[in-house]
A protein has these predicted regions:
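Structured interaction patches on ligand/partner-binding surfaces of diverse proteins
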Residues: 1, 8, 64-87, 214
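Viral virion structural and adsorption modules
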Residues: 1-12, 59
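Structural motif
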Residues: 9-27
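Solvent-exposed strand-loop boundary residues in beta-sheet-rich modules
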Residues: 20, 34-36, 63-65
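Short, acidic Ser/Thr/Gly-rich low-complexity loop/linker segments typical of extracellular
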Residues: 32-46
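Short Pro-Gly-centered beta-turn/loop motif in secreted/extracellular proteins
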Residues: 46-58, 63, 77
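Collagenous Gly-X-Y triple-helix signature in extracellular proteins
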Residues: 84-303
Length: 303
């Protein structure tokens, strides 16, 4: 244990926890804003500290001299805190710890499935890429919902792709209502994903888009641009996600039945359509006001 040397009224109890047995024996340090440090060792998947209250601290998990996790927290008067510091691929905070340590390739394989909660209900997500464009995004894992949401949705209320995905009703929904439905720990670790997407209206011009939750561009799925602007690949740098190199993985279902599902790429040859994936897993496009399946994506990347 890492109890403080002195007694303070209203001490704050902090418990570093992990669900991974491999974290036992690793060192946990806590450093105050004034530079005082406490140290302990993970045992039985936890390490406890009693700290002076009303201060800001930094907690770190260290293995072999390498800091695998670090975060700041505030310790209130008489407060009890549990802080997850371990490498657990099945929890949002554990995944964040893994990518912060640069160990995503050791813990994840493309095709792994992880369960997250949406409005308190379990939903299965596929690992569609590990370390996607690492030179751009750093250490990361990309997740996409295995099945589409139960409710199909329009990309826009009318048949237009003007402004691209960034101006769509779908974007507003996914970054708003849907994001807010995710468990709070997951919301806290999702990375704002920045990429170059088409502006629509039959243009090959691109715009920078930033989203917490997003849909893939056509190239992410097919490794080609059949109906999207080729600049999403040649200028924007999009790459195919490894999960979708297997064509069978491109077929998705909503409510147990295979469905057409939306992509974020505007259809480059007209102004009314967005790219999509048909029930056979092939590239296609549909009018923006049609209701189709939605398979949300997000990235968890290192700080």
């Amino acid at each position: 244990m890492g109890f403080a040397d002195d007694f303070y009224y209203g001490q704050c109890k902090v418990v570093a926890v992990t669900t991974a047995s491999a974290d036992n024996g690793k060192t946990v340090t806590i450093t105050s804003s004034g530079g005082r440090t406490w140290s302990g060792t993970m045992a039985s998947k936890k390490c406890e500290f009693m700290l002076p209250p009303r201060d800001k601290y930094t907690i770190a998990l260290i293995s072999g001299g390498v800091t695998q996790f670090s975060t700041d927290f505030f310790c209130g008067y008489g407060e009890y805190l549990e802080i997850e510091v371990g490498m657990n691929k099945n929890t949002a905070l554990g995944i964040k710890n893994i990518v912060n340590a640069g160990l995503e390739a050791d813990y994840f394989q493309v095709g792994d499935q992880i369960t997250f909660k949406e409005n308190g209900v379990d939903a299965t997500y596929d690992v569609v890429e590990v370390a996607y464009r690492q030179g751009v995004y750093g250490h990361n894992v990309v997740f996409q919902r295995h099945a589409c949401l139960n409710t199909t949705r329009q990309m826009n209320a009318s048949n237009t792709n003007a402004g691209g995905y960034n101006s769509s009703l779908m974007k507003t929904y996914l970054d708003g209502e849907f994001f807010n439905s995710l468990e709070s720990d997951l919301q806290d670790v999702i990375t704002e994903y920045s990429y170059q997407g088409s502006v629509g209206s039959q243009s090959t011009n691109l715009q920078t888009e930033e989203h917490k939750v997003f849909l893939p561009v056509e190239y992410n799925i097919f490794g080609a641009t059949s109906y999207a602007a080729g600049t999403e690949r040649t200028t924007g740098g999009a790459e195919q996600w490894s999960y979708y190199a297997t064509s069978a993985n491109r077929v998705k279902a909503a409510n147990g039945a295979s469905c057409v599902w939306w992509l974020s790429s505007p259809y480059v040859s007209d102004s009314a359509t967005f790219c999509s994936v048909n029930t056979s897993g092939a590239a296609t496009g549909d009018n923006a006001s049609n209701s189709h399946g939605v398979a949300p994506c997000f990235m968890i990347a290192a700080d």
